[in-house]
Amino acid sequence: MELRLYDTLTRDKRPFTPIDPANVRMYVCGPTVYDFAHIGNARPVIVFDVLFRLLRHLYGEAHVKYVRNITDVDDKINDRAARDYPGLPLNEAIRKVTEQTERQFHDDVDALGCLRPTVEPRATEHIGEMRSIIEKLVAGGFAYVEQDHVLFSPSAMNAANGVLPRYGSLANRSLDEMIAGARVDVAPYKRDATDFVLWKPSKPGEPSWPSPAGIATPGRPGWHIECSAMSWKHLGETFDIHGGGIDLVFPHHENEVAQSCCAFHTKRMAQTWMHNGFLQVEGEKMSKSLGNFITIRELLATNKFGGRSWDGATLRLAMLKTHYRQPIDWTVDALEEAQKRVAKYRRTLERFRGGKNVEVPHGVVSALSDDLNTHAAITELDALNRRANGVTHEGPTSEADALAANAIAADELRASLRLLGISVASERSGAVNQIFDQNIQRLIAVRTAARANKDWKESDRIRDELAAMGVVLKDGKDADGKPVTTWELAR
């Protein structure tokens, strides 16, 4: 089946042809580990996890290499470490911040059903590669040293007259437009407003390494050089796919292209550039000042959003309901809809436990192969779910034949959910089962109190919330005539 992907550089959807089908290579920009990941950060993680799964499905698990970096050297990390651990030496405080944040990031994305990348390199483990690229750029006349800084010159790149890509081509901006949009105050060590930092001197106490290009003062890398170095180390000078959020197109990805292409004298850093759209919350831009800033952890473990916590499958399905290139409005209504859909799938798979290993249906793979159209793929899931729960063909048939057809559809639904990374937990582990049961009992207790106070509105709300989880309540009385509520999973 032909995979077609939208390329940000060429601005069209075209067939994806890997450089080497036996070694398909993808790089995605990962987190800067200074704070817990918010729901906007979750979108590229989920989107490119689905692409990783699809590539493995099409080319074989052993033939796909996915690299997602960890940025563990950055001004924001330094600031957070100094704030949170004022009594510690800065380097020790930085280690605490980065280790804690990276651990929380992994817990969060694991809960969202994401596979770990093939390689997850840290920036601080690739300083040697960064220095090597910088040395190449200085030697080639694309970078210069000024006041213990090393800076890249886009003007020098564009002077190559077609031998290299034009700086600004990924973002579709001219150099003049970028100069006009630059801030009035240009750092004194820059020759031009568009020049950007590859390396800078470290202040006393800050992380530092021996500097490149003959600079005596120890320093540290700029942000953009980190990804060029890590992608080069693990994927080579040119690779198949580079992904990230739309906010990274300029300047980060534009600068990556400049560094890598000029250092290695290539026309393309990546064959295909993919970017997911923005996320807003209830129709507004997410920001702490508006009070709608929410982390993945808060969604999973608190009642901050919508008055309840949400499971990872619900969050993932809600994210995938919108095509990755479109903006997404993160709303309570959308999560409730996703939760109901997960509950429907769960009930179906509970009915058909066990099952057989079957191929993912053509309709699901076809949808995903059309520029990762997860919205269309979910429509296919809904159709499979309906087939598993009713007769959709005409003509006389035996009950056994009908049940067999239902079971096949359920098996195909299970395989499709697995490809999309959506775990509906049809067979919960003991620990998860205990948490699930405890949560239900807690809600029943709250509902019982509401009924005792004749708060029928609250009682109905909790009943509906449990119904969305696939739980059916039965109200009755015990042997002493006291009200009692029992529950079971819907069938």
From Swiss-Prot:
Signal peptide range in chain numbering = none
**One Gene Ontology term, aspect cellular component:** cytosol
Q: According to its UniProt record, where is this protein mainly located?
A: cytoplasm
The protein's location, in the record's own words, is: Cytoplasm
UniProt binding sites for Zn(2+): 29, 227, 252, 256
Q: What cofactor does this protein call for?
A: Zn(2+)
Q: Superkingdom of this entry's organism?
A: Bacteria
**InterPro entries given for it?**
Cys-tRNA-ligase (IPR015803), Cys-tRNA/MSH_ligase (IPR024909), CysS_C (IPR056411), Rossmann-like_a/b/a_fold (IPR014729), tRNA-synt_1_cat_dom (IPR032678), tRNAsynth_Ia_anticodon-bd (IPR009080)
Motif 'HIGH' region: residue span? 31-41
Motif range ('KMSKS' region): 285-289
The record ties this protein, via Gene3D superfamilies, to:
Anticodon-binding domain of a subclass of class I aminoacyl-tRNA synthetases, HUPs
Q: Note the subunit structure.
A: Monomer.
The record ties this protein, via PANTHER family, to: CYSTEINE--TRNA LIGASE, CYTOPLASMIC, CYSTEINYL-TRNA SYNTHETASE
Q: What NCBIfam families does UniProt report for this protein, alphabetically?
A: cysS
* Family named by the database record: Belongs to the class-I aminoacyl-tRNA synthetase family.
Protein known as:
Cysteine--tRNA ligase
Protein species of origin: Rhodopseudomonas palustris (strain TIE-1)
Q: Tell me the organism's taxonomic lineage.
A: Bacteria, Pseudomonadati, Pseudomonadota, Alphaproteobacteria, Hyphomicrobiales
